[in-house]
From Swiss-Prot:
F(1)F(0) ATP synthase produces ATP from ADP in the presence of a proton or sodium gradient. F-type ATPases consist of two structural domains, F(1) containing the extramembraneous catalytic core and F(0) containing the membrane proton channel, linked together by a central stalk and a peripheral stalk. During catalysis, ATP synthesis in the catalytic domain of F(1) is coupled via a rotary mechanism of the central stalk subunits to proton translocation. This is ATP synthase subunit b. It is found in: Cell membrane. The chain crosses the membrane at residues 9-29. InterPro entries: ATP_synth_B-like_membr_sf, ATP_synth_b/b'su_bac/chlpt, ATP_synth_F0_bsu_bac, ATP_synthase_B_chain. GO terms for molecular function: proton-transporting ATP synthase activity, rotational mechanism; proton-transporting ATPase activity, rotational mechanism. It is a single-pass membrane protein. Keywords: ATP synthesis, Cell membrane, CF(0), Hydrogen ion transport, Ion transport, Membrane, Transmembrane, Transmembrane helix, Transport. It comes from Bacillus cereus (strain G9842). Its main location: membrane. Belongs to the ATPase B chain family. GO terms for cellular component: plasma membrane; proton-transporting ATP synthase complex. It comes from the Bacteria. F-type ATPases have 2 components, F(1) - the catalytic core - and F(0) - the membrane proton channel. F(1) has five subunits: alpha(3), beta(3), gamma(1), delta(1), epsilon(1). F(0) has three main subunits: a(1), b(2) and c(10-14). The alpha and beta chains form an alternating ring which encloses part of the gamma chain. F(1) is attached to F(0) by a central stalk formed by the gamma and epsilon chains, while a peripheral stalk is formed by the delta and b chains.
């Protein structure tokens, strides 16, 4: 005899059979479909988590590398600036050395020229004294030839040369 379920004419046996089949299907789905499906989902979740972690590590490493590169660039700029400053200082020092050497050489040339001028002046004065003495002797010998002896003439000339030498 069929029982009615909520006023519908569905036999109880069919309902029990359908419920039994449904329960078997649920058990089979749980064992063969849900288990592996949940395992795959779990693996996928772990894979995605691992990928996210790897991406975060890569991102952190990239940020670290960028920071290191910035620091290296900053350090390179500082070193370049120091190198430029050292080169400028070296150039100034070298300029000072060259200028000092040039001044020293100029002073040496000037001193040498002054000595040369002094020597030539002394030579010119000596030559002039000799010429004056020679001319004086000639003039004096003509003028005084009759009045002075030769010894007196020589003494007179020597005195005259001394006077000319002291006058300079």
């Amino acid at each position: 005899m069929p029982t009615l379920l909520l006023g519908a004419a569905i036999p109880f046996g069919t309902i029990a059979y359908t419920l039994f089949i449904f329960l078997i299907l649920l058990v089979m789905l749980r064992k063969f479909a849900w288990g592996p499906l949940m395992g795959i989902m779990k693996e996928r979740e772990e894979h995605v988590t691992n990928e996210i972690d790897a991406a975060e590590r890569s991102n952190a490493e990239a940020k670290k590398l960028v920071e290191e590169q910035r620091e290296m660039l900053k350090q390179s700029r500082v070193e370049a600036q120091e190198l430029i400053e050292r080169a400028k200082k070296q150039a100034v020092d070298q300029k000072d050395v060259i200028v000092a050497a040039a001044k020293e050489e100029a002073e040496s040339i000037k001193a040498s020229a002054v000595q040369e001028i002094q020597r030539e002046k002394e030579q010119a004065i000596a030559a002039l004294q000799e010429q004056v003495a020679s001319l004086s002797v000639q003039i004096a010998s003509k003028v005084i030839e009759k009045e002075l002896k030769e010894e007196d003439q020589v003494k007179l000339i020597r005195d005259y040369i001394k006077e000319v030498g002291e006058a300079r």
